[in-house]
From Swiss-Prot:
Gene3D superfamilies: Glycoprotein, Type 4 Pilin (3.30.700.10). Major component of the type IV fimbriae that plays an essential role in twitching motility, natural transformation, and protease secretion. It is a single-pass membrane protein. It comes from Dichelobacter nodosus (Bacteroides nodosus). This is Type IV major fimbrial protein FimA. GO terms for cellular component: membrane; type IV pilus. Pfam families: N_methyl, Pilin.
């Protein structure tokens, strides 16, 4: 009488484990990039919220709430879960021929890892900085002091290479 085979052989199981390992080798780094990119996007959301404050401050001729206030003073920052955004810079109020695409002198410096959930931030963006320079038309462009990897910078503010 023939015996029936029940279950899988060891070779079949080893092949399945190897395939899962290969898939995981590609999936885990892609997932880590996805997490870092989503956390980095929070910084741009914070900066967009500061646009209104900057516009209010510009009516008084300064980028910050008080012309004598330094970075981090009340009204000049916004803290999120993964980042801290701070208004800095000197308003170019004496420039007479500024075009909408020119910089107005105001900056928002976003430092990752200084938010309320600092220990849960991706290691790929922790302690990195995204500097956004405000244009006359109110939009932002990437500043030179940026240390955040280009692949994590939102396309809306990324410098054209």
């Amino acid at each position: 009488m023939k015996s029936l085979q029940k279950g899988f052989t060891l070779i079949e199981l080893m092949i399945v484990v190897a395939i899962i390992g290969i898939l995981a080798a590609f999936a885990i780094p892609a997932y880590n990039d996805y997490i870092a990119r989503s956390q980095a996007a929070e910084g741009l959301t914070l900066a967009d919220g500061l646009k209104i404050r900057i516009a209010d401050h510009l009516e008084n001729g300064s980028c910050t709430e008080d012309a004598n206030a330094g970075a981090g003073e009340k009204g000049n920052e916004d803290k999120g879960k993964y980042a801290l955004a701070v208004i800095e810079g000197d308003y170019a109020q004496n420039a007479t021929d500024l075009k909408p695409e020119d910089k107005n002198g105001c900056k928002v410096v976003i430092t990752y890892g200084q938010g309320t959930a600092g220990s849960k931030i991706s290691k790929l963006i922790d302690t990195k900085v995204l500097e956004l320079e405000q244009l006359v038309n109110g939009s932002y462009t990437q500043g030179d002091a940026t240390t955040l990897d280009a692949k994590f910078i939102p396309n809306a503010v990324k410098k054209s290479q």
